[in-house]
Amino acid sequence: MPFADRVKVNFDHPDSMDTPLLAENVRQLRAGQAIERPTYDYANFQRLKGTVRIEPRAAIIVEGILIFESKALRELLDIKIFVDTDPDLRFIRRLVRDIRDRGRTTQMVVDQYIKTVRPMHLEFVEPSKRYADVIIPEGGHNDVGIDLVIQKIKSLVPRPTDS
């Protein structure tokens, strides 16, 4: 797809994600199989040809703002955590990241935020909080919440045995 067309895609809508592939990758990792994770060029809005090999581990962390939108994916997750961040802080982080890392202008970021980011957040991301087992407020700066999550993960991950 030409760059001019890729720029027009709403990447904040769940349909823009390859959720079936992500779900299959999670299934494979849970089954003890390595996967080849696609790589993306966010500055140019495209999936690259190369992949990154991911080996299975005792704990698998899947992150993304739209992961709770898919029931099939939710069913593969043992713990679902939603990190709730103030909207102003989310916008500032996006503005800084997109200018610094993706070559965007301030106006481009503002336009995208108004046109797609905020509406999609309100339609898909915010309502998906209801599927979370844990909601951590303060954008991850909540030490008590984070400590509780760490303890829960440790309780689920088998301890290595001494040989």
Task: Explain the meaning of each model-derived region.
Residues 1-44, 59:
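Conserved nucleotide-sensing/catalytic segment adjacent to the nucleotide-binding pocket
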Residues 22, 90-93, 147:
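Short, charged, surface-exposed secondary-structure boundary motifs
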Residues 28, 34-35, 56, 106-112:
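Short, basic, glycine/proline-bearing loop/turn elements
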Residues 32-37, 85-90, 107, 141:
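Conserved Switch II/interswitch segment of TRAFAC-class P-loop GTPases
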Residues 39-48, 60-65, 115-119:
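Short gly/ser/thr-rich secondary-structure transition/capping motifs
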Residues 48-102, 157:
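ATP-dependent NMP and nucleoside kinases share a basic, alpha-helical "lid"
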Residues 55-56, 96-99, 118-163:
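NTP-dependent small-molecule kinase module
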Residues 72, 82-83, 88, 104-114, ...:
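Anionic, Ser/Thr-rich low-complexity intrinsically disordered regions
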